[in-house]
UniProtKB/Swiss-Prot annotation:
Top-rank lineage group of the source organism: Eukaryota
Recorded consequence of changing S91A: Reduced ASK7-mediated phosphorylation, enhanced stabilization at the plasma membrane and increased cell division
Localization terms from the record: Cytoplasm; Cytoplasm, Cell cortex
Effect of T193A: Reduced ASK7-mediated phosphorylation, enhanced stabilization at the plasma membrane and increased cell division
Keywords, sorted A to Z: Coiled coil, Cytoplasm, Phosphoprotein
Organism: Arabidopsis thaliana (Mouse-ear cress)
GO cellular component, one term: cell cortex
Sequence positions bearing Phosphoserine: S79, S91, S94, S235, S308, S309, S320, S321, S336
Assembly mode: Component of a complex made of POLAR, BASL, ASK7/BIN2 and ASK3/SK12. Interacts with BASL, ASK7/BIN2 and ASK3/SK12.
Tissue: Expressed in stomatal lineage cells with asymmetric division potential.
Protein name per UniProt: Protein POLAR LOCALIZATION DURING ASYMMETRIC DIVISION AND REDISTRIBUTION
Amino acid sequence: MEGSRRRRGDGCTIVQCYTPRRFVGRWLSGLRSSKGKRDAGEEQEDDTRRYQLAPIRCSTSLNQLVMQDNKQNCRLNKSKEPETNTFESQSRESPLEVGIGSFLLYLVVASKTELDKMTNLRMQMEMFLLNAKEQLQKKDTPMSSNEASGFQFSPQEFSNLASSIFQESSSSVLQEEYTEFEVSEPEDYRRGTDCNSKLQAEVGRLPLGEKAEDRQTKHQIQRQCKLKDNEVTKSHIPEMVVSDERYGVCPYELDKKLHELLETRQQEELVKLETALNRVERRLQEKETEVSWWKDAARLLAQRVPESSRSGLEWCNPDSSTCSERSVPRSYEACSIHRTSFSR
């Protein structure tokens, strides 16, 4: 409830707003003034009706009547004074009561709005707490399941862990065995070195055309020796078998199976290498027999050729470091430095 009053100043209008208390006070004062005027008019009418003058009969009676009227007026004034005092006190107290009532109404409305806000905040907080509890329960359920099961792992995780542990253990054991093998140098290792040296010597004796094949065989033989060394090292590895009832295969059993597979493959490769070695040995024997045949043929020819024809030839001694080349008949050829051979 608001009222306004306009005032005109220097070419502009100024609007003055009243407070609710002032507006209610002015409204109540207007009502009181109109009510007071009505009451005063009614009292005057009553007085005129009560105190109408009687017809004048004589002078003495007039004086008496005037005295009586004055007395009655004094009495009436005395009786009206407390009534006016009570009315003024009531008129002063009524705007205060109205203002207090309006203020109380305003407080009630404001408190209601605040209570509504508080209820909304309470509902929001309850929803937030419920969501937080649900999230915490969801996070705690996998941890509780792991604790209840005694930290059980899934099969995939266990297989990954087993493979990693197996690799680490196998690498450490192999390193230890290799170090022991290098320090001890068993007889198998020495035999392998002897084989390599013999093969190198035989390959040096072969002619130039067959050196490519001999290189391949040499490479295969070296691989064979390495595989034998690996077999020796694997024979020293301790076989440890640990049975696990929860899961299917133990890592040590897997290690054993892998070693068996490797051994079978290595044996197959060894068989192939042995066959290749046998072929090379056969070829070497054939070449040696051919060389011996050529030597025998040369001796026979030397015995049968007359001395006059042998004068033009100078034989190359295999023990001598140098060999002189001279004119040789077309049907014969001199050999290289280290051995002699003739071809027709």
